[in-house]
Amino acid sequence: MNKETSKTVLVPIDGSQNALRALDYLGLIFGSKYKLKVILFYLLPSLPPILIEESKKIDKIARKLTELEKKNSTMAQLILSEGKKRLLDKGFKEQAVETVFQKREVGIARDICNWSENMRADAIIISTRGLSRLKTFFMGETANKVLEFNRSCPVWMVKGAVRRKNVLLAIDNSQNAMRAVDYAGFILPGTEAHVTIFHSKRDLKRFMPNGLLEEFPEFQKFWKHKAGEMVAPYLKKAKEILIKAGLKEDQVSIKLVDGSESAGIDILKEVENSDAGTIFLGKRGCSDVKDYSMGSVAKKVLYQASDMTVCIVP
């Protein structure tokens, strides 16, 4: 994919400082020179249906409701203006940042997913914490629902303050993992990120009790060799895809390690070793053991990640 092709990113915000961290992350990973169209998206808080029904019967309530809706829209415009100014201050061009607000239609998470699908967005970038008192869509429950309902658009979960540009691309030998590679090749050329293609070989302890394996050390040795042999072509292919997509050869490296009993822990440990601030994962991995799948490895990484972004590719 040509790195000059403009990418569309949907960023839901709610006015909290935590939500605005997604904008700081945009500036960090992409920068103002990257061809990006940013859509700042705000969902208006909804009123109880009973109030709306009463407004149809009582003029006084109807007038107050109209006044409240105007203030609601004004607040939305202020929040979106603040977000846009934050990006403009980072060097983004005026025409590259669009602001949109709307009433909730189906539900917060579904509205976000529907909007991204209609706009054919290339990414949803969302902070996982927002206004806790109001429990808006940046709280964990709704952010997880965005992952659940989303069918096609990669979701970037910004967890805390991210300060590192490098990317860890964790893969196995599944088609889903290779989709994450293709997406990295689509979205990362033009950035300054160094990409480490990473795989931790499954330890046999993930399959059976440790006590049984101690008597058969040759199995562990054979397994490590075979596991590395199986994944090596995929690691090589992943690097070729990224370089062909436009990343420089010195921007991409491969790391294959002997894994522990937890692939998620291996990934998080390697994030520190490679000085990465972003993890790319396929939503599901090998169907037989579900490596890097939601509900197992990806879920563990999302839960334990701090001050980093996790990009889940469906």
Task: Show the residue positions of the predicted features.
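Small/aliphatic-rich secondary-structure junction motif
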Residues: 1-66, 165-224, 228, 240-253
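Gly/Ser-rich helix-loop-strand patches that form or flank binding pockets
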Residues: 2-8, 18, 31-33, 111-163, ...
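Fold-core signature of tandem repeat domains
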Residues: 9, 80, 112, 181, ...
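Residue-level marker for beta-strand->alpha-helix junctions and adjacent short loops that shape enzyme
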Residues: 16, 45, 104, 131-132, ...
